[in-house]
Amino acid sequence: MKQSEVKELSVAELQEELGKSRKAYSDLKMAHAVSPLENPIQLRTVRRDVARLATELTKREQQ
């Protein structure tokens, strides 16, 4: 998810997407631990998506 897409989401949508992304990251890490992923770069992209969402959520809560 790109930063421009993240900025357009509401706070409730951000929280929902953050939960989904964290779950996806957890699932990918578990799958990678059991057997190597075909594309391990997925871990990095999902982790960065989680960071983008969390950063935007924190920024909005402070305003």
From Swiss-Prot:
According to its UniProt record, what is one Pfam family this protein matches? Ribosomal_L29
Entry GO terms, CC: ribonucleoprotein complex; ribosome
InterPro entries to which the protein is assigned, alphabetical: Ribosomal_uL29 (IPR001854), Ribosomal_uL29_CS (IPR018254), Ribosomal_uL29_sf (IPR036049)
Origin superkingdom: Bacteria
Task: Please give a single GO biological process term from the UniProt record.
Answer: translation
Family stated for the protein in its record? Belongs to the universal ribosomal protein uL29 family.
- Identify the HAMAP family for this entry: Ribosomal_uL29
Native organism is Christiangramia forsetii (strain DSM 17595 / CGMCC 1.15422 / KT0803)
Instruction: Kindly indicate whether the keyword Ribonucleoprotein belongs to this entry.
Output: yes
**Record's keyword annotation contains Ribosomal protein:** yes
Record key words, sorted: Ribonucleoprotein, Ribosomal protein
Per its record, what are the GO molecular function terms? structural constituent of ribosome
Q: What is this protein called?
A: Large ribosomal subunit protein uL29
